[in-house]
Structures are given as C-alpha cells and as structure tokens.
Amino acid sequence: MCQLLGMNCNTPTDIVFSFEGFRRRAGLTDSHSDGFGIAFFEGKGVRIFRDNQAGHSSPIADCVKQYHIKSFNVIAHIRKATQGEVTIENTHPFIREIWGENWVFAHNGNLTSFPDMSESFCQPIGSTDSEAAFCYMAEQLKNRFRKKPTEEQIFQVIQEITKELTQGGTFNFILSNGEWMIAHCSTNLHYITRKAPFGTAQRIDDDGVIDFRQHTTEKDKVTIITTFPLTKDEIWTKMEHGGFVFFKDGDKVYEVLGTPKETIDDGTLGNAKAA
C-alpha cells in the first residue's frame, strides 16, 4: 500500500528534513514508486506538486527539496498502486473545494467497496478508491451543513463518514483545510510533536542529521504524522487502530482512541535500517 506524511505547526515551517527521508521510501529503501505528491497550504491557496514517477528520482521532488517552502500545513504521499493506473490523475494528494476552502486529502489503504459517485456533484477525476472516498466525504459534509460548522462538529462528522467507508477496507488518511489537520489510523500511523527544548534527530533511511535548535524558536510547535517513523532517536506515538486525532497549531486538540496494536512493519523499517 501507500505511505503518508503530514505536518501541522504553529509557525511556517519547511518539511525538507522529513520529506527527504520519506521520499527515499519511494523506490530506494522501499517500493512505493508509483508516483508521489505533496501539497503546501499558503493562506487560502494550495501549492501542489505531483508526479507519476518514483519520488526518490523525480525532478519535481528535487525541486521541492531545493525550494524550502514554508507552511503551517503540508500533506505528502508516496504511492504503491492497488487500484487505478499509474497516472497523474491517480496521484495523491487530492484537492476539493468545501465551503469555499481548499481541502486536501491523502489515503493509505485499499477499499474493495466504496460509494458510486458517478451521479454525484463531487465526482472523481481518476480511477482510485481513494479519490472516490474523498469525493463521498466532501459531498456528505456539504449535504449535512450548508455553511461551515464548528471544528468540533467537523471532527465528529468525519468520524461518522469514516466509519461508513472503513466497512469497505483499510482507510488510513490525513486531511486538512489549511487551519487544522485530521489523521485517522486503520493500521499504521505515527506522529511526533517537536517543541522546546529542541534537540537533534537522525533519519532512519539515510542517517541524515539535523539540529532543530538552529532552525526554531522557543515558541515553535511542529507535529509530524507519518505511516512509519522517520527518525531513529526520537519517541514517536503510534495511533491506535480506529483512532482519530485533530491537530491545530502543532497541538493535539481532540483525540478519539481506538484499539492499541503494535506497529506491523511491512518491510519499510527493516529496509530503511539496512540501507
């Protein structure tokens, strides 16, 4: 299946350190090489880069590395296709308008059954289960609320819609409107919140090292969400199966617990450590 990466923080931050480890899993330390994408929220807009080439060798991914774009919310995805051809339109993250806002979504999993959206107002452009599920989510939200509801209401309804969709299979996802970020875990999803006092970190996939003290202030809070941990010397929290977390400004605001289960390594961590 695919892998996810998200960042939510209280100050504009670049995601290059995490992204560089993450993209190595797109064909070097792991086999998620059927395309990559990354979306940066900038005010009300979204700067999105996608390629159907493997993320580790994509010139577009190289551009992202060199650009050092800073954002409050970022979502990235590396694809290992289960449904749909390896094309740009099937590459995550996906974006839709909801209540006059850009919403961005990326999914890891496989839905063997999902709603038919062929006659809906919000229709998929590609042929993935992921985009169809996002379109269903967007349409359900708009049907239930004519105007934008509270964040707590959004979080509650996302849970209800997700429970419908998970009946069709595995549905890990990260979702953001540029103000907050919601993560749901079906199998594997981990997060870490970095805040003062900051220290150093070493990547699992290539031993890259960073000293966060050189790039932060005492007020900064940065939460990273990913399928599997990206660093070897930090403590990551594994989300519970069926759990939801709502992040804003780098803080965990709401959480719904699921069933605690240990990380099931699909080969990613073993391959990364051996690389």
Predicted regions and their residues:
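A conserved acidic, glycine/proline-rich C-terminal tail/linker
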Residues: T200-F244
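Extreme N-terminus nucleophile/cap motif
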Residues: M1-P59, V74, A201, G242-F244, ...
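Gly/Ser/Thr-rich active-site loops/lids in small-molecule metabolic enzymes
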Residues: G126-D129, T187-I210
